[in-house]
Regions:
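Non-Sec secretion/translocation targeting segments of pathogen effectors
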Residues: 314-370
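TerminUS-proximal long segments
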Residues: 268-306
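Short amphipathic alpha-helix segments
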Residues: 9, 219-233
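A short linear hydrophobic-aromatic micro-motif
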Residues: 22-24, 237-241
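C-terminal structured domain segments
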Residues: 244-281
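Charged, alpha-helical interface segments at or near domain boundaries
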Residues: 24-209
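N-terminal, positively charged regions that mediate nucleic acid binding
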Residues: 2-23, 31-35, 39-41
């Protein structure tokens, strides 16, 4: 059996021998994860095929030559497939200069992404960071691209403007489902009842999932204060927020949890055993107080160590060490949702500015302002 380096170099060489102009480049993901990816050289936008995922399949018995054949067909399809044609013709200039910019936000861990955050416009949000991305679906591509400092500067967008635009776009993006139903549906949200659409949450729903329509980067919904207030009003009580992943959050009625440390232990265990490292959000548990309209880190010991601060204004500086956020009163895989199967995802795409564009593949046949 080949080791990882032999595998990646051999795959690239075999593809070159088949006539493909490919190279290998490291791609920085969230939480400090760096993965090697195959890409087509000399293209404005190219498929990125992540090699660690392929090697893992190889280690578990997948035939190397069948994998080579699949990657070859995939690369060939890039030249003729209509969806790929949309990707090849995609221009970030068109996206960023459009009248209704498809900009949204997501949350990532501050501690685990210190280096990445140096390259991205962002603001602190408790022990997380709020970053921004563009949704390319309106341009015929099921994908996203993180907004970097250089992109924001090129298109004359400040962090404050990004925050405002994303908040407007995310206003109607939220979906709330029963966790048990979502697990049983294997993530097929077409089969689920959206509590935000019905306007009520049944008592039988002990845990429920907060995400967006595409169940992709849904963690950013935690920044939407009106949304949290609406859900708490539907519950009629306070709630805990479990950071399931960067894609979704799990909400729990506070009265049903005698000690938030129980939830924190659950988060730790699931992060270690189930959630892919690059999709982990944090190890914290958060508490939403319905009466105070505030979101805070639930673990009092952590808050004390970090010098808990309270703010009455939503206009918080990006560099503030914030462990509690007061909302403006005038403004009115087990416990997580099912993980994505890597075989059901497109590789990411990158353009000439080296911006990663991750997008998902259909199954194949076989903010509140701080």
């Amino acid at each position: 059996m080949m080791d990882y380096n032999e595998f990646k170099e051999g795959l690239a060489e075999d593809l070159i021998n088949k006539g493909f102009e490919v190279g290998i480049q490291p791609v920085t993901k969230t939480n400090g994860v760096i993965e090697d990816a195959l890409y087509v050289m000399g293209r404005k936008a190219s498929p990125l095929i992540y090699l660690p995922e392929l090697y893992e399949q190889y280690e578990h018995g997948a035939d190397y030559y069948e994998m080579l054949s699949y990657v070859s067909e995939y690369m060939a399809g890039y030249e003729r497939d209509s969806h790929f044609r949309a990707v090849r013709s995609l221009s970030l200039d068109d996206v960023m200069r459009s009248t209704q910019k498809p900009i949204y936000s997501m949350l990532i861990s501050r501690h685990e992404n210190e280096e990445l955050l140096k390259t991205l416009p962002h603001r602190d949000f408790l022990d997380m960071a709020q970053i921004y991305y563009v949704d390319l679906s309106e341009f015929g591509v099921q994908g996203t691209a993180k907004i970097t400092n250089s992109m924001a500067e090129e298109f004359n967008l400040t962090e404050e403007e990004l925050n405002k635009i994303s908040g407007t776009n995310m206003r109607f993006a939220a979906k709330c489902y029963d966790l048990g139903d979502m697990v049983l549906s294997f993530g097929n949200t077409d089969l689920l009842t959206d509590f935000l659409s019905t306007g009520s949450i049944p008592e039988s729903a002990g845990m429920f999932v907060l995400t967006n329509e595409g169940t992709h980067f849904g963690s950013g919904l935690l920044t939407q204060k009106d949304l949290l207030d609406r859900i708490a009003e539907m519950l009629g009580e306070n709630m805990y927020v479990i950071p399931s992943s960067i894609h979704e959050l799990i909400l729990v009625r506070a009265d049903s949890v005698p000690d938030p440390e129980i939830l924190k232990g659950m988060v730790h265990d699931v992060n270690e055993s189930t959630v892919d490292e690059k999709e982990r959000l944090t190890g914290s548990v958060y508490h939403y107080d319905r009466n105070e309209r505030s979101l805070s880190i639930a673990c009092a010991e952590y808050a004390q160590d970090r010098n808990l601060k309270e703010f009455a204004s939503p206009d918080l500086g990006r560099e503030a060490d914030i462990e509690r956020i007061e909302l403006d009163p005038t403004d009115r895989d087990r416990h997580a949702a099912p993980r994505r199967d890597p075989a059901e995802e497109y590789p990411a795409f990158t353009d000439q500015k080296d911006q990663e564009i991750g997008y998902r593949q259909p199954k194949r046949d076989k903010g509140y302002e701080q």
